[in-house]
C-alpha cells in the first residue's frame, strides 16, 4: 500500500528547473505529445452523455471521465490502475489526466501557422525574402510559386498567375515545378540552406552602402542565425499536424434543460476536423483541382481562426454574432491566462466587509467580526478541537462549529491570539495598501480599522470595503508580523516621512488644546510640574488655553544613549503642558510649545522616530490619537453659516475691478487692444481681485478682538471654527473658504479656456441662475477628469512596475566610484530643495571637502549620509556632492545596497533582496491620481512676468560666476558673451543660495567674488532684442551693405531716430540674394584686425532682420553693441503639465520642435542656404571633420558666425530632447534632466518623492546599447543589446587581446524597455503577447527567471525579500553540481571529520 501512495505522489512531482525555453514544435514532437488522433468532429452523445469514440472528447484518447473507472464500467477502483479495458479501450486512471493529455489531427494538407505569417515582421516572409502580400497569394491559392525551375528561364520563388502558369506549362512541359498553397511554401522553407545563406549575408552586408538595405539584410541575418542556433527548422512554421487541447481545458458543461454550454474552442476544432475530413475524401475521389483548392483554402482559414481568430480577414462568429475566442485570445489581454490566472489569483481564507472606525484600537490591532473570524480560521479550530479531544473527527468538529457551541468561541480566541491577518484595500497603489494586524474579535459585521492607518490605505469610512486574508503557514505569519505589521510601517517608502500621521479630528483636537487664549481663567499662574497642572485643570481652576508658567524637565538622549536633564521654567499653556505629559522621554518641550498644526505633528512624529526609536513612536502615536479625539470632543468645534464671515472690503474691491475692466473694454472698442490682449488683461484683473478678496477674508477670519486682563482691547488669533479647521490643517483650505466666504472667482469652460466674467458671489450669499450655470461646467469637468485620471494613472503605474520589476538589491557593494553630482535645486532666488534633503540617505562616492578649505575632508567616500552627517555638511558649506546612484551602479543583475543607499521605509541601509524596482514604480505611480490631467495655457500674468530685464539679489553674499566668457567695457562693467553662464550668490559658509541664468549680452555690474547686499541689482539687459557685441575695438567698415539691395532704412515716427534694417534674403532683389552683409574692424593703421591669438579676421555677419545705427568708419569700443536682433515675444506655448508630462518623460518621447544642440565642439559658420533651411557648420579646432546641420529658417538661433560652441550647447531653443542629452552630454546630465523635470511636476502638487526612485526607473530605461561596430565579438553592428551583455563580450575580447565592440547608450521609453527585457514571460504578460511569444519561439529564447514577474507566473517564490535567500541557496547548489566539489570544500569536510 505504501508504494501505491508513493506512486501517487510521484505522479505530480514537479522537476526543479532554472529556466524555461520555448521553441517551435516539430510534427514528430506534436505526435509524441498526443495520445491518439481525433478523427471525428462529434463531442458527446446527447442521449447517453458519453463521449463519442475518436471525437473531440473521446475517453480512449484523453482518459476516463470518472476517477479510476473505464467508460463501459468493466474496471473500477484503484486496484486496476493502468489497465486498458479491452472492451472500450480506455485506460483506468484518475480523471484529471483529461486536463493534461493531448490529441492531434493529421492535416490532409499543410497549413501555415498564422502567427509566423501575420505577426509583424512576418517570419516566413523574412526567411523567404518575399512580401507578405505575395506569400498570402500563394497560401490562399491565388497564384503559383516556382519551387524548382529546372532548365527553364523561370526563377525559383517567382509568382505565376493562372494564365502565366498554363503558358509556362505549354512552353516547358513538366520541366519545372510550381505549386500553390502551404505545401509550396513548406517546400521553399525546407530547401533553405541556413548555413550558406548566413555566410552569403555576412559577406553582403559590408559591401552595401544603403542604410535601408543594411537594415533589411541584418534583420534577415539575425533571424537566420536565430534559427540556426536554436535548432528550429524553418519548415516547422508550416503545420502538418495540429495538436488538440486536452478536453477539460475546453469543457462542455450541461446546462439545465438539456442544453450545453461549450467553450468556443470546440466549435473551432469542429470546423477544422470537418474541413479536414472533407478534404481527405475529396483527395481520395480525385476531385477537380478547383474544388480541392477551395477546400484547402477553407482548411487554412479554419486553422487560422483556431490559432488566432480575427487576425486575418473577418473573425469567425458564433450563433450570437460574437467572434469566437481562439487560442491566442485565451492568453492575451487583461482576461487572458497571464494577467487573469497567473499574475492574479483568487485566494482562499479571505473575506471582505465594510470598514468602520476603531478609535479604541491600538496601532497593531484591527477589529474582526466574530462570524468572519470563525469562517476564516476554520481549519485551525478543527485541528484544535481534535487535538483537545473535544471532537473525534473533522466531521464532528465541523458540526460543532456550525452549531456555534460555546467551547468553539473559547478556542477561536486561542487560535486568533497573535495570529496576524492581512487587510487590503483596493486599489492597492503601493505596498502600504496591504498591512498586517492582530485581530480583536468584535460583535457586528463590519471590520474595525485603526484611524491612523487610513492615510496609508487612502481609506475613509463612507462605505469603503476591505478584504481580510489569513497567512496560514508559520513562515507566512512570521513575515506578516515582522515585515507587514502596521507598527513596522511608520515611514512612507516614497519619501521616508512618517505616514502614520494624525489627520482631521485628531489634528483639530491637538490644535485646540495647544492654542493660547488671552485672558483665560488662570492666566499667569505658575506650576511646579506637570502633575500640578493636571490637578489644577481637573479642579477647573484653570482653562485649557490659559497662558501659564510651568517647570519643565527636558531630557536629551545623545547617540550613546547618555541622558542630559535640564529643568527650566517656561512660558506655555495648560494644554501644551498636558500634551507634553504623554511624550516619551528624550523629546524636547520645544516640539510641543507651539500651535500643533498638522505639519507640526508630522515633524513631531518624525523627530520621535529618529530620536527614541520605533517602539516608543508607536505607543506615542496611539497616545496622541486618543488625546486628540478626547480634546476634539471637548472643543465642541462646529460650523454654522455665520462662521463664514464675508469681509467688508469685498464690495470695494469688486467695484474697483469692474471699473478697470470697463476701461479696458473701452480701449478695446477704440482699437488700442487686440481681442487676445483684452482677454488676458481682464483675466489678470479678476485674478488679482480674487486674491485681494481672499486675503481680506482670511485676515478678517483669522483675527478677533478681545479684552485682556488689563482691560485693553487687543487682537488675537481667532477661535472661529472655520478658521481653526483650515489653520490646523484638519479640513479645508483657504481656496475652499474663499468660495464660501470670499468670491467663487473665475470658472473654466469645458475646453479649458477661462470665462471672462467671474462669479463674484460666494456660497454664503448664494449664486444666481447664470452663476450657477457657469459653475456647473467646472464641477462636471472635475468629475470627468477624475475618472480619466484614475485610468491613466493606473496604466502609468503598470508600465512602471513592468519596466522595473526585476530590479532587486543583489549585492552589498559593487565598488564603483562613479556617481551623480547632486546640487541643491535652486530656482531664481529661492532654494526649492536644499542639498541636505537631496543627499540624505545616500552614500558618498568620493571624499567631500569643505567649501573653505580644499584639504579638509568633511565626509570620507563610502559614508551613508544620515541626519547628523548632513548637518555637518550644511555647516561646512558644501554645495555639491558626488553620491552613488542606481544609475551608475555596476552590479550585473540588480543594484548594490551602497548605490541605493537608505531604505526609506526603515531608515537604515537597504537590505539585500529588497525589491527596489517595484517600490520605485509604486512611489511614482501612487500619487499619480493627485496630478492634474490638464495642459496649462500660459495667459496674462505669466506671459508678462517673463519679460525680466534685471537680476536683483534677494540675500546678501558673495558673487560666483559660472562658465563665464566675458569682455570688459570701458566703464569697467563686464558683458557676457557666452550662453550657458550663470550667476550665483553664496552665503558666508560658501553655500549657494541663489542661482540665475545669464543670457547673452547681459551687462554685469559686479565681478567674481564681490560682496553684494540684499536688493542690489547686479545685471541688466534688454529683454526684447538680442545684441551682437564686439569683442575687440577698432574702426568699423561695412561690407555688402547696400541701401535697397541688402538693407533698408527705417525712421521711427515718434522719436525721429533712424535705424538700418538688414533685409531678409527672400525680400531682396535678385542682385542681393547671395550677398552677406558684414562689418569688418580695422586697426589704427587701416589693417584688418585679427582676433587675439588667432589668424581669424574680425568680421561680424549681420543676420537678416537685425537693426543697426552705425555709420561706415565709426570707431567702436570693446563690448559695444553693433546690431540688435528683435526677439518676437515668444508665442504663448501650452505647457503640458501633470500626468501627461510624467508619462511623456518616462516614455522618452521626442518633443515636437526640440532644442537643437551642438553635436561637436568648434567654431560656428553658416554654409549655403537651401529653400527654407539654414545650413549651420561647426568646425572643430583640432582639424577633424566639420559637422553640418540644416535648420529651418524660422528657428531662432542662439549663435552667430565665428562663435565657438561646446558639444551639447544649445544652438536653438526649444523643449529638450532626452535622447540628444544622453547622446551628447552623457548619462549624468540625462538623469539630472529627467529627475528635475519629474520632480517639478510632483512638487507643484505638493507631493514629495525621493530622487532615487526616479533614478531606478532611469536605470531601466538606459540598460540597452546600440552596437556601433562589432570589433572581434559575436555581436552584430546595429544590434540593440543589454549593456551587461556587451560589457561581458568586451571583457572576453579584452582577455583574448581582441578588438572590443564600440557602443552607444540608448534611451528607451518604459513601454519599449519592458518589451525589450531579456525575459519573454515578463514581456508577454505585459503587452503585445502574440508578438513577444512568436519572436521567443522562433529564436528559441531561454528565460532565466531572474525577475519577479516570471517567478510569479511559474509559481515560485520571488527572488526578492525572504525569497532571495531561497534562490541564492538554489544557485549555490547548482554551481556545486555543475562545478563538482572544489578542493577547499574537500579540505573543509576532511578537517570537520577529523575534528569530531
Swiss-Prot record:
- The name this protein carries in UniProt is DNA-directed RNA polymerase subunit beta'
Write down the SMART domains for this protein, in alphabetical order: RPOLA_N
Report a single Gene Ontology molecular function: DNA-directed RNA polymerase activity
Q: Which residues bind Zn(2+) 1?
A: 70, 72, 85, 88
Positions bound to Mg(2+): 460, 462, 464
Organism listed in the record? Hahella chejuensis (strain KCTC 2396)
Named cofactor requirement(s): Mg(2+); Zn(2+)
The alphabetized UniProt keywords are: DNA-directed RNA polymerase, Magnesium, Metal-binding, Nucleotidyltransferase, Transcription, Transferase, Zinc
Task: Briefly state the protein's biological role.
Answer: DNA-dependent RNA polymerase catalyzes the transcription of DNA into RNA using the four ribonucleoside triphosphates as substrates.
One Pfam family of this protein, by short name?
Answer: RNA_pol_Rpb1_3
Broadest EC class? transferase
Q: Output the Gene Ontology cellular-component terms.
A: DNA-directed RNA polymerase complex
Q: How does it assemble?
A: The RNAP catalytic core consists of 2 alpha, 1 beta, 1 beta' and 1 omega subunit. When a sigma factor is associated with the core the holoenzyme is formed, which can initiate transcription.
The Gene Ontology biological process terms listed for this entry are: DNA-templated transcription
Task: State the similarity comment.
Answer: Belongs to the RNA polymerase beta' chain family.
Binding locations of Zn(2+) 2? 814, 889, 896, 899
| Cofactor notes | Binds 1 Mg(2+) ion per subunit.
Q: Which domain of life is it from?
A: Bacteria
Q: Does the keyword Magnesium apply?
A: yes
EC number assigned by the record: 2.7.7.6
Show the catalytic activity. Answer: RNA(n) + a ribonucleoside 5'-triphosphate = RNA(n+1) + diphosphate
Q: Which InterPro entries match?
A: DNA-dir_RpoC_beta_prime, DNA-dir_RpoC_beta_prime_bact, RNA_pol_asu, RNA_pol_N, RNA_pol_Rpb1_1, RNA_pol_Rpb1_3, RNA_pol_Rpb1_3_sf, RNA_pol_Rpb1_4
Amino acid at each position: 500500500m505504501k508504494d501505491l501512495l508513493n506512486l501517487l505522489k510521484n505522479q505530480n512531482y514537479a522537476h526543479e528547473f532554472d529556466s524555461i525555453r520555448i521553441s517551435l514544435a516539430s510534427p514528430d514532437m506534436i505526435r509524441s505529445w498526443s495520445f491518439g488522433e481525433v478523427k471525428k468532429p462529434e463531442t458527446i452523445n446527447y442521449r447517453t452523455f458519453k463521449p463519442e469514440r475518436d471525437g473531440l472528447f473521446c475517453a480512449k484518447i484523453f482518459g476516463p471521465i470518472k476517477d479510476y473507472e473505464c467508460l463501459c464500467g468493466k474496471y473500477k477502483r484503484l486496484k486496476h490502475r493502468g489497465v486498458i479495458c479491452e472492451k472500450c479501450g480506455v485506460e483506468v486512471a484518475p480523471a484529471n489526466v483529461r486536463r493534461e493529455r493531448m490529441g492531434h489531427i493529421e492535416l490532409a494538407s499543410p497549413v501555415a501557422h498564422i502567427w509566423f505569417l501575420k505577426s509583424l515582421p512576418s517570419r516566413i516572409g523574412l526567411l523567404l525574402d518575399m512580401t507578405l502580400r505575395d506569400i498570402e497569394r500563394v497560401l490562399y491559392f491565388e497564384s503559383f510559386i516556382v519551387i524548382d525551375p529546372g532548365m527553364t528561364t523561370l526563377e525559383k520563388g517567382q509568382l505565376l498567375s493562372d494564365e502565366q502558369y498554363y503558358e509556362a506549362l505549354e512552353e516547358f512541359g513538366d520541366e519545372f515545378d510550381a505549386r500553390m498553397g502551404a505545401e509550396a511554401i513548406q517546400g521553399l522553407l525546407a530547401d533553405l540552406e541556413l548555413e550558406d545563406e548566413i555566410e552569403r549575408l555576412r559577406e553582403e552586408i559590408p559591401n552595401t552602402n544603403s542604410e535601408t538595405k543594411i537594415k533589411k539584410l541584418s534583420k534577415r541575418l539575425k533571424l537566420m542565425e536565430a534559427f540556426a542556433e536554436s535548432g528550429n527548422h524553418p519548415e516547422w512554421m508550416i503545420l502538418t499536424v495540429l495538436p488538440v487541447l486536452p478536453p477539460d481545458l475546453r469543457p462542455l458543461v450541461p446546462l439545465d434543460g438539456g442544453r450545453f454550454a461549450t467553450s468556443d474552442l470546440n466549435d473551432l476544432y469542429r470546423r477544422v476536423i470537418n474541413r479536414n475530413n472533407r478534404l481527405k475524401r475529396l483527395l481520395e475521389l480525385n476531385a477537380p483541382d478547383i474544388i480541392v483548392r477551395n477546400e484547402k483554402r477553407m482548411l487554412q482559414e479554419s486553422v487560422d481562426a483556431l490559432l488566432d481568430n480575427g487576425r486575418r480577414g473577418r473573425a469567425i462568429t458564433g450563433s450570437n454574432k460574437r467572434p469566437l475566442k481562439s487560442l491566442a485570445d485565451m492568453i492575451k489581454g487583461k482576461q487572458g491566462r497571464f494577467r487573469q490566472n497567473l499574475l492574479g489569483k483568487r485566494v482562499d481564507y479571505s473575506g471582505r466587509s465594510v470598514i468602520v472606525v476603531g478609535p479604541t484600537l491600538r496601532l497593531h490591532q484591527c477589529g474582526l467580526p466574530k462570524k468572519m473570524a470563525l469562517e476564516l480560521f476554520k481549519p485551525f479550530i478543527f485541528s484544535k478541537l481534535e487535538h483537545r479531544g473535544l471532537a473525534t473527527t473533522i466531521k464532528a468538529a465541523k458540526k460543532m462549529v456550525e452549531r456555534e457551541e460555546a467551547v468553539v468561541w473559547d478556542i477561536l480566541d486561542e487560535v486568533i491570539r497573535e495570529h496576524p491577518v492581512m487587510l487590503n484595500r483596493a486599489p492597492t497603489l503601493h505596498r502600504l495598501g496591504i498591512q498586517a494586524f492582530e485581530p480583536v474579535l468584535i460583535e457586528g459585521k463590519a471590520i474595525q480599522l485603526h484611524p491612523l492607518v487610513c492615510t496609508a490605505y487612502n481609506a475613509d469610512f463612507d462605505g469603503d470595503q476591505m478584504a481580510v486574508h489569513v497567512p496560514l503557514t508559520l513562515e507566512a505569519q512570521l513575515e506578516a508580523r515582522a515585515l507587514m505589521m502596521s507598527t513596522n510601517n511608520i515611514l512612507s517608502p516614497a519619501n521616508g516621512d512618517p505616514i502614520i500621521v494624525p489627520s482631521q479630528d485628531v489634528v483639530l483636537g491637538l490644535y485646540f488644546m495647544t492654542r493660547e487664549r488671552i485672558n483665560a481663567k488662570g492666566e499667569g499662574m505658575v506650576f511646579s510640574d506637570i502633575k500640578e497642572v493636571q490637578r489644577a485643570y481637573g479642579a477647573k481652576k484653570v482653562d485649557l488655553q490659559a497662558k501659564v508658567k510651568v517647570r519643565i524637565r527636558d531630557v536629551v538622549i545623545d547617540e550613546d544613549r547618555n541622558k542630559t536633564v535640564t529643568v527650566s521654567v517656561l512660558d506655555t499653556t495648560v494644554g501644551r503642558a498636558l500634551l507634553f505629559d504623554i511624550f516619551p522621554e528624550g523629546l524636547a518641550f520645544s516640539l510641543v510649545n507651539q500651535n500643533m498644526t498638522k505639519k507640526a505633528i508630522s515633524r513631531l512624529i518624525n523627530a520621535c522616530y529618529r530620536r527614541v526609536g520605533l517602539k516608543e513612536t508607536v505607543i506615542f502615536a496611539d497616545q496622541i490619537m486618543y488625546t486628540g479625539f478626547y480634546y476634539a470632543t471637548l472643543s465642541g468645534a462646529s460650523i454654522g453659516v455665520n462662521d463664514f464671515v464675508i469681509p467688508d472690503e469685498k464690495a470695494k474691491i469688486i467695484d474697483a475691478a469692474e471699473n478697470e475692466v470697463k476701461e479696458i473694454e473701452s480701449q478695446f472698442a477704440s482699437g488700442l487692444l487686440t481681442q487676445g490682449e483684452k482677454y488676458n488683461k481682464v483675466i489678470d484683473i479678476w485674478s488679482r481681485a480674487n486674491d485681494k478678496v481672499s486675503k481680506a477674508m482670511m485676515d478678517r477670519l483669522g483675527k478677533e478682538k478681545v479684552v485682556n486682563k488689563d482691560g485693553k482691547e487687543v487682537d488675537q488669533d481667532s477661535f472661529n471654527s472655520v478658521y481653526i479647521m483650515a489653520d490646523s490643517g484638519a479640513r479645508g483650505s483657504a481656496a475652499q473658504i474663499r468660495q464660501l466666504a470670499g468670491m467663487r472667482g473665475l470658472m473654466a469652460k469645458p475646453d479649458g479656456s477661462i470665462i471672462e466674467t467671474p462669479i463674484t458671489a460666494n456660497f454664503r450669499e448664494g449664486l444666481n441662475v447664470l452663476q450657477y450655470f457657469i459653475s456647473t461646467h467646472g464641477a462636471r469637468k472635475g468629475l470627468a477628469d477624475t475618472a480619466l485620471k484614475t485610468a491613466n494613472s493606473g496604466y502609468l503605474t503598470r508600465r512602471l512596475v513592468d519596466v522595473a520589476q526585476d530590479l532587486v538589491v543583489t549585492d552589498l557593494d559593487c565598488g564603483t566610484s562613479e556617481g551623480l553630482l547632486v546640487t541643491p535645486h535652486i530656482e531664481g532666488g529661492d532654494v526649492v530643495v536644499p542639498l541636505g534633503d537631496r543627499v540624505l540617505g545616500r552614500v558618498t562616492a568620493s571624499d567631500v571637502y569643505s567649501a573653505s578649505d580644499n584639504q579638509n575632508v568633511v565626509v570620507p567616500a563610502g559614508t551613508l549620509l544620515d541626519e547628523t552627517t548632513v548637518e555637518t555638511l550644511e555647516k561646512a558649506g558644501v554645495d555639491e556632492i558626488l553620491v552613488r546612484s542606481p544609475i551608475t551602479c555596476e552590479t550585473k543583475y540588480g543594484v548594490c545596497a551602497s548605490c541605493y543607499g537608505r531604505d526609506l521605509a526603515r531608515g537604515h541601509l537597504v537590505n539585500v533582496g529588497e525589491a527596489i524596482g517595484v517600490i520605485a514604480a509604486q512611489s511614482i505611480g501612487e500619487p499619480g491620481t493627485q496630478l492634474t490631467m490638464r495642459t496649462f495655457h500660459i495667459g496674462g500674468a505669466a506671459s508678462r512676468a517673463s519679460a525680466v530685464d534685471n537680476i536683483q539679489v534677494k540675500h546678501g553674499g558673495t558673487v560666483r560666476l559660472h562658465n563665464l566668457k566675458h569682455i570688459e567695457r570701458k566703464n569697467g562693467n563686464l558683458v557676457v558673451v557666452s550662453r550657458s553662464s550663470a550667476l550665483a550668490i553664496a552665503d558666508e559658509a560658501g553655500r549657494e543660495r541663489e542661482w540665475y541664468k545669464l543670457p547673452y549680452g547681459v551687462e554685469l555690474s559686479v565681478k567674481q567674488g564681490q560682496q553684494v547686499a540684499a536688493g542690489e541689482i547686479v545685471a541688466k539687459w534688454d529683454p526684447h532684442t538680442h545684441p551682437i557685441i564686439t569683442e575687440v575695438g577698432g574702426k568699423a567698415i561695412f561690407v555688402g551693405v547696400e541701401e535697397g539691395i541688402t538693407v533698408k532704412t527705417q525712421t521711427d515716427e515718434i522719436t525721429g531716430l533712424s535705424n538700418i534694417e538688414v533685409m531678409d534674403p527672400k525680400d531682396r532683389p535678385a542682385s542681393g540674394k547671395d550677398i552677406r552683409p558684414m562689418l569688418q574692424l580695422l586697426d589704427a593703421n587701416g589693417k584688418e584686425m585679427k582676433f587675439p591669438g588667432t589668424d581669424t579676421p574680425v568680421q561680424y555677419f549681420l543676420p537678416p532682420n537685425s537693426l543697426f545705427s552705425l555709420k561706415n568708419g565709426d570707431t567702436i569700443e570693446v563690448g559695444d553693441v553693433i546690431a540688435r536682433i528683435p526677439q518676437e515675444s515668444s508665442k504663448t506655448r501650452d505647457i503640458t503639465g501633470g500626468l501627461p508630462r510624467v508619462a511623456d518623460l518616462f516614455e522618452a518621447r521626442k518633443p515636437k520642435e526640440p532644442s537643437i544642440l551642438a553635436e561637436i565642439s568648434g567654431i560656428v559658420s553658416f554654409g549655403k542656404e537651401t529653400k527654407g533651411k539654414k545650413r549651420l557648420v561647426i568646425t572643430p579646432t583640432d582639424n577633424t571633420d566639420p559637422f553640418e546641420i540644416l535648420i529651418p529658417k524660422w528657428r531662432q538661433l542662439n549663435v552667430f558666425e565665428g562663435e565657438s560652441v561646446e558639444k551639447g550647447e544649445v544652438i536653438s531653443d526649444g523643449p529638450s530632447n532626452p535622447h540628444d542629452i544622453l547622446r551628447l552630454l552623457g548619462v549624468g546630465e540625462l538623469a539630472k534632466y529627467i529627475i528635475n523635470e519629474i520632480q517639478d511636476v510632483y512638487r507643484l502638487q505638493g507631493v514629495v518623492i525621493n530622487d532615487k526612485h526616479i533614478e531606478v526607473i532611469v536605470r531601466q530605461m538606459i540598460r540597452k546599447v546600440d552596437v556601433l561596430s562589432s570589433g572581434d565579438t559575436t555581436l552584430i553592428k546595429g544590434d540593440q543589446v543589454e549593456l551587461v551583455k556587451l560589457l561581458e563580450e568586451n571583457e572576453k575580447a579584452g582577455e583574448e587581446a581582441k578588438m572590443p565592440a564600440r557602443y552607444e547608450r540608448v534611451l528607451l521609453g518604459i513601454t519599449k524597455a519592458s518589451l525589450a527585457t531579456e525575459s519573454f514571460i515578463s514581456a508577454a504578460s505585459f503587452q503585445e503577447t502574440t508578438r513577444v511569444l512568436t519572436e521567443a519561439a522562433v529564436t528559441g529564447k531561454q528565460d532565466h527567471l531572474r525577475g519577479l514577474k516570471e517567478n510569479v507566473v511559474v509559481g515560485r517564490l520571488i527572488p526578492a525579500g525572504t525569497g532571495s535567500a531561497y534562490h541564492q541557496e538554489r544557485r549555490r547548489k547548482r554551481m556545486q553540481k555543475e562545478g563538482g566539489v572544489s578542493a577547499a570544500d574537500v579540505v573543509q569536510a576532511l578537517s570537520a571529520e577529523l575534528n569530531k
